[in-house]
Amino acid sequence: MEEPEEATQATQEAPLHVSQNIAKQVVNNENVFMKLVMTRMLDGKTEVIPLTTDVHNGFWRFGRHKSCEVVLNGPRVSNFHFEIYQGHRNDSDESENVVFLHDHSSNGTFLNFERLAKNSRTILSNGDEIRIGLGVPKDEISFLCQVPVKHSRDSQKNMIKSENSHYEIIRTLGSGTFAVVKLAVEVNSGKWYAIKIINKRKILLTSSEKRATEMFQREIDILKSLHHPGVVQCHEIFENDDELFIVMEYVEGGDLMDFLIANGSIDEQDCKPLLKQLLETLLHLHKQGVTHRDIKPENILITNDFHLKISDFGLAKVIHGTGTFLETFCGTMGYLAPEVLKSKNVNLDGGYDDKVDIWSLGCVLYVMLTASIPFASSSQAKCIELISKGAYPIEPLLENEISEEGIDLINRMLEINPEKRISESEALQHPWFYTVSTHEHRTPPSSSEHEATEQLNSSS
């Protein structure tokens, strides 16, 4: 398909425009063959685009040209970038219907992080991610594909049902020792959720049934009681004989660790509102009597408009049986406070308070500013020694030109004596928040930042 002659520079128009005539046709249309959830837009807003066979014979064109069914504006968008349509898998009219993605772009269309060959087509499936401008975060536009249940093969196999809702599983988001997290869509509302599925039998093998039940109930009560914009919200909780399901809001931007690995350190001035958000969330949690105990970049999720939400309140992680605390928490040891490591009898009522979260958040701040881990060693014993002494390297902070106020705040958050460690409310009043960084944002990352990103990759 030839692209019309038109200027290729970026425009100042809205990033997304769907023809009003088309928009009216697709509302409540039973002929929708796919929904695209725009999980990353230039304006930070999430849009849902239902694709129907009633529009343009079922061929949906995406691009910058005004004749496209979906008009996208951005420096990486071609006039006709790609099209999506429904068709037969092969030339036979009796073959099954599938959904095709056909690339026509100059700058590239990416499917699940792989660039498609120009003018090639591929079959789309539930949970596929289409991207434009991959590798340039400020220009990136992305879509998440949802095939309606009636078009999905083995749909019943991929369904989870509670008393009031049906969820279609799209793909796996992550997994741990006792739990797996799935991306799912609630069939009736079309809303996206992250469902944590906890294997109760695995937990019961490592702990008494009474202890496990008490821990479950305690954590469930915490999840139900937390209502704050800085906390991932719980939608519903239900269970069967083998599994417990926690349905949480889906935060589309991924976690902070993935962001840092992809983009390197965050400019000091840009870190200030992010840390402020996290401190305010911790202040709320601690006032509610909740200590998170596992603050780390992987448990901090990012919305499209870069609001941070704390997740994972340890339902799968706090359960441990005969294994030692360090064996259970070895993956997150680099963020643990000294008093936690020194505690000989670690349990939910251990001898430490909510200052442990301040220490962990100090580590997170260090990681954001430097893209490196403050307490890292190939030896577990050496890592414990470094944490116990509060001995983190100052060089990455100096190389990133972090201000004296920024270094002072980190020092006060990483104070090994919890009684002397700064509190959330004190940290929010620290001079760092009220000084302006004198150096500009550094782009592209330097070679030292590249090495730091490699360290993050190896530690995550």
From Swiss-Prot:
Gene3D superfamilies: 2.60.200.20, Transferase(Phosphotransferase) domain 1. Autophosphorylated. Residues 60-116 form the FHA domain. The modification Phosphothreonine is found at residue 443. The active site is at 294 (proton acceptor). Residues 167-433 form the Protein kinase domain. Its EC number is 2.7.11.1. GO terms for molecular function: ATP binding; protein serine kinase activity; protein serine/threonine kinase activity. Keywords: ATP-binding, Cell cycle, Kinase, Nucleotide-binding, Phosphoprotein, Serine/threonine-protein kinase, Transferase. Residues 438-453 have a biased composition (Basic and acidic residues). One of its GO terms (cellular component) is cytosol. It holds the Pfam family Pkinase. One of its GO terms (biological process) is meiotic recombination checkpoint signaling. Residues 438-460 are annotated as: Disordered. ATP binds at residues 173-181, 196. Has a role in the DNA replication-monitoring S/G2 checkpoint system. It is responsible for blocking mitosis in the S phase. It monitors DNA synthesis by interacting with DNA polymerase alpha and sends a signal to block the onset of mitosis while DNA synthesis is in progress. Phosphorylates rad60 and dna2. Interacts with rad26. Belongs to the protein kinase superfamily. CAMK Ser/Thr protein kinase family. CHEK2 subfamily. This is Serine/threonine-protein kinase cds1. It comes from Schizosaccharomyces pombe (strain 972 / ATCC 24843). The gene is cds1.
